[in-house]
């Protein structure tokens, strides 16, 4: 991947959507919910404060994170789907 986020942005690879219900029924593409978690694949340099100091990012490549249902901008690169979002759009890190 050749995407490098700027400032306090991160690039997240969303988890795949559920293919079937717990009862075993297959979900059509139109009925699938977008996942609200994924893995960070790239991290920007950090947010620039008003005094010019760069604030270090709190997330790292490879971490699994939770984010809002409508967070980020969807992009497709080389056939892969990604979300570009600000670090502040991330709610939590999954251990």
UniProtKB/Swiss-Prot annotation:
Report the CDD domains cross-referenced here: cpn10 (cd00320)
Cellular compartment(s): Cytoplasm
Q: Name one GO biological process term.
A: chaperone cofactor-dependent protein refolding
Q: Which InterPro entries match?
A: Chaperonin_GroES, Chaperonin_GroES_sf, Chaprnonin_Cpn10_CS, GroES-like_sf
> Keywords on this record?
Chaperone, Cytoplasm
Example of a GO cellular component annotation carried by this entry: cytoplasm
Which GO terms of the molecular function aspect are on file?
ATP binding; metal ion binding; protein folding chaperone; protein-folding chaperone binding; unfolded protein binding
Keyword Aminoacyl-tRNA synthetase belongs to the record: no
Q: Which NCBIfam families match?
A: PRK00364.1-2 (NF001527), PRK00364.2-2 (NF001531), PRK00364.2-4 (NF001533), PRK00364.2-5 (NF001534)
Q: Which family does it belong to?
A: Belongs to the GroES chaperonin family.
Function as written in the Swiss-Prot or TrEMBL entry: Together with the chaperonin GroEL, plays an essential role in assisting protein folding. The GroEL-GroES system forms a nano-cage that allows encapsulation of the non-native substrate proteins and provides a physical environment optimized to promote and accelerate protein folding. GroES binds to the apical surface of the GroEL ring, thereby capping the opening of the GroEL channel.
Q: How does it assemble?
A: Heptamer of 7 subunits arranged in a ring. Interacts with the chaperonin GroEL.
Q: What is this protein called?
A: Co-chaperonin GroES
Q: Which organism is it from?
A: Prosthecochloris aestuarii (strain DSM 271 / SK 413)
Gene coding for it: groES
